[in-house]
Design a protein with these regions (language model features):
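Short helix/loop segment flanking the catalytic signature motif in cyclic-nucleotide metabolism enzymes
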Residues: 95, 122-143
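A short pre-motif secondary-structure segment
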Residues: 112-115, 156
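Residue-level recognition of strand-loop junctions within catalytic nucleotide-signaling folds
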Residues: 85, 124-128, 167-168
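Signal-transducing coiled-coil linker helices
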Residues: 2-41, 49-60, 111-112
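Catalytic-core segments of nucleotide cyclases and related cyclic-nucleotide turnover enzymes
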Residues: 89, 134-138, 142, 146-153, ...
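Active-site-proximal alpha-helical element of nucleotidyl cyclase-like catalytic domains
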Residues: 91-110
């Protein structure tokens, strides 16, 4: 009788442990699926799927009047195609990773940073004083960019184009239209960098 009880207790303990490990495995699997779906594998930033979710969430909060100020920033590397053609895609990837690091170091504590396409990035900053956050972030970005470009034996400099808008429903109507406005300013900046007007 005692042996039967002991065997029963052991079976229950083993069953409980198996269920616990299954739960842990399911959680790990769930975390891994989430990471694959919403995290950019190359840079570690949130990816386009995460960006689209955040854009939708922000639009809903704006529609409800729950957001006072919204800053939208867009960033794009200059000359990635030339870097890839001249030095190879792995060298270009290193520049993309460095670009992501610089943007995240400049804006990551204040906002949400995303890699939305090959060499294109976006940042949403929600809260008070977004213009100041932008100005401070761009100063930091330029400082980090200059620091990287002083790397010995660097084959190609890193040049990051940027543009921003502060959301205003009268001007833009939707977050999507505001993003287009930030895109336009970013491409103007990229052209100025190519012409040497911005260092």
């Amino acid at each position: 009788m005692r042996t039967a009880i002991l065997i029963g207790v052991v079976i229950l303990a083993v069953d409980s442990l198996c269920k616990l490990f299954e739960g842990i495995k399911e959680t790990e699997l769930s975390n891994k699926v989430f990471e694959i779906k919403y995290k950019d594998a190359l840079t570690g930033l949130a990816n386009r799927n995460a960006y689209e979710l955040k854009e939708k969430e922000i639009q809903e909060k704006l529609d409800k009047g729950e957001i006072d100020e919204l800053l939208i920033c867009k960033f794009d590397m200059n000359d990635l195609r030339k870097i890839n053609d001249n030095y190879g895609h792995s060298y270009g990837d290193r520049h993309i990773v460095k670009c992501a690091e610089i943007i995240n170091q400049s804006f990551g504590k204040s906002g949400y940073t995303f890699r939305v396409d090959g060499d294109e990035f976006a940042v949403f900053v929600i809260g008070d004083g977004v213009e100041y956050i932008y100005e401070r972030g761009i100063l930091r970005l330029k400082e980090l960019e200059r620091e990287f470009n002083r790397t010995p034996n660097l084959l190609a400099p890193l040049r990051i184009g940027y543009g921003h808008v502060i959301y205003n429903s009268d001007t833009f109507g939707t977050v999507e239209k505001a993003v287009s406005g930030a895109d336009k300013k970013m491409y103007e900046c990229k052209d100025m960098i190519k012409k040497g007007a911005i260092v």
